[in-house]
């Protein structure tokens, strides 16, 4: 009998409701999903369907109104706010549409930022930073600040930063939205390589057909409801 693979992420009957001027809006409406190690999954749907809300819930940036989310077997609802911050830094990597790099820090300092917060020894931090910048093709841009980098290069720094603490998975919210075609394909090549070689789990939200074409799994949301969940043959 095969051992059951523990899900990296489990979402159990989750709801997220907002009250806007006395009108109740169900942004997420009874979603149940799970993601396993090595998934390269894409969440799609029209604007307002709940894609970003769902990613924020998975990453512990927002709390569900009802239901339960487990990361590597840990219930997010049982963590105190301070514990949740530490848990996110250890287990979840984030890549945002607008890069979210710190303007006054160099590429290397941005990548090492969370490691610095976690008080990694200097030599260990430097070695990990060097390894990551090399893995995203930026070994020659350690000292460059975000303003000295193209959009594609900034997003590659963001991916390196997200990988710094060897998280369970990466959440990527519209990561190619601000990139030209060449930069987007280059970024996706890097993410796909990390997925293939290191079994890094990626969960995207996107409107980008280029991302969808590479996905192993496409989940479609409409009005906060999962209307389809398809395995893709690449």
What does each model-identified segment do?
Residues 1-17, 228-234:
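ABC-family P-loop ATPase nucleotide-binding domain
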Residues 218-230:
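H-loop (His-switch) and adjacent beta-strand-loop-beta switch element
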């Amino acid at each position: 009998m095969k051992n059951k693979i523990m899900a990296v992420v489990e979402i159990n009957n989750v709801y997220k409701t907002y009250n806007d001027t006395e009108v109740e809006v169900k942004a997420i409406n009874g979603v149940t999903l799970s993601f396993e190690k090595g998934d390269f999954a894409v969440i799609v749907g029209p604007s307002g369907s709940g894609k970003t809300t769902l990613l924020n819930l998975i990453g512990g940036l927002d709390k569900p109104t009802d239901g339960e989310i487990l990361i590597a077997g840990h219930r997010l609802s049982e963590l105190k706010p301070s514990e949740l911050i530490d848990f996110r830094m250890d287990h979840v990597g984030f890549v945002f549409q607008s890069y979210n790099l710190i303007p006054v820090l160099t590429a290397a300092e941005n990548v090492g930022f969370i490691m610095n917060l976690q008080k990694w020894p200097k030599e260990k931090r430097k070695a990990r930073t060097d390894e990551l910048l090399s893995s995203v093709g930026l070994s020659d841009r350690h000292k460059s600040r975000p303003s000295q980098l193209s959009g594609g290069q900034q997003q590659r720094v963001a991916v390196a930063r997200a990988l710094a603490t060897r998280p369970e998975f990466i959440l990527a919210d519209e990561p190619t939205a601000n990139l030209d075609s060449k930069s987007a394909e280059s970024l996706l090549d890097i993410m796909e390589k990390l997925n293939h070689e290191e079994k890094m789990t990626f969960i995207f939200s996107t409107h980008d057909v280029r991302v969808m074409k590479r996905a192993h799994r496409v989940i479609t949301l409409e009005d906060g409801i999962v209307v389809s969940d398809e395995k893709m043959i690449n």
